[in-house]
């Protein structure tokens, strides 16, 4: 039984410089929505930008920060989104680590529509900083948010609706997500590395599991 001899250990995320948000931190009049993933098609940024554009057309108040690594010569959908969202865009493009950590502490909502997400380091960083997640109910995300799935995950086709609900009443959604930021810090490298060390030490002492090759 291969499954019985296997154990998946998550990657560690460096959260040492990610700020911790106070549980009684005030909710801003204009919340900031953060998109902080790699600028590539598998992250499905167009779906996020379309949702934000529709909510902007409805007159819902929010600001947008679009950050992440970009190796594309012509990220057309990003350029169009910046033009459409106009003055709502408060940050656009790559940030060095100190500036990025500062932004994490100021953002209010982190959003994703990714088609492929094997873990989700950027999302973990944002949740650890106190951002309320708006994530699809697939990929790695259910495993990240655990007991907060009803708060953090939206169903297929439900991005715009969930994002609207969150932006209209962010304090209520934050109240439902209390504890998620602390829970996600279980992926901090300083926590994960002790599990790595324990398992490698047992393997060195006891040898591989029976039947392993």
Predicted features along the sequence, with ranges:
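Short alpha-helical donor nucleotide-sugar binding micro-motif in glycosyltransferases
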Residues: 102-107
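Short hydrophobic beta-strand element within catalytic cores of glycosyltransferases
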Residues: 132-135
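A charged, aromatic-enriched C-terminal amphipathic alpha-helix characteristic of glycosyltransferases
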Residues: 158, 171-207
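Aromatic "clamp/platform" in nucleotide-sugar-dependent glycosyltransferases that forms part
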Residues: 115
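Donor nucleotide-sugar binding/catalytic pocket of nucleotide-sugar-dependent glycosyltransferases
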Residues: 1-20
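Conserved donor-binding/catalytic core segment of Leloir-type glycosyltransferases
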Residues: 24-43, 49-53
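Nucleotide-activated donor-binding/catalytic signature segment of Leloir-type glycosyltransferases, i.e.
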Residues: 76-95
């Amino acid at each position: 039984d291969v499954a019985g001899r296997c154990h998946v250990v998550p990657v560690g995320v460096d959260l040492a410089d990610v700020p911790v948000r106070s549980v009684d931190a005030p909710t801003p009049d204009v919340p900031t929505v953060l998109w902080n993933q790699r600028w590539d098609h598998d992250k499905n940024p167009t779906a996020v930008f379309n949702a934000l554009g529709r909510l902007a057309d409805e007159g819902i108040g929010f600001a947008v920060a679009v950050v992440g690594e970009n190796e594309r010569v012509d990220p057309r959908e990003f350029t169009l989104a910046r033009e459409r969202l106009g003055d709502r865009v408060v940050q656009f493009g790559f940030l060095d680590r100190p500036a990025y950590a500062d932004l994490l502490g100021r953002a209010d909502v982190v959003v994703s529509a990714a088609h492929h997400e094997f873990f989700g380091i950027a999302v973990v960083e944002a949740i650890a900083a106190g951002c309320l997640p708006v994530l699809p109910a697939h990929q790695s995300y259910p495993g990240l948010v655990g007991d907060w799935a009803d708060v953090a995950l939206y169903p297929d086709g439900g991005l715009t609706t969930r994002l609207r609900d969150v932006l209209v009443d962010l304090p209520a959604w934050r109240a439902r997500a209390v504890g998620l930021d602390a829970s996600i810090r279980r992926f901090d490298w300083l926590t994960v590395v002790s599990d790595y060390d324990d398992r490698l030490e047992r393997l060195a002492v006891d040898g591989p599991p029976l039947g392993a090759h």
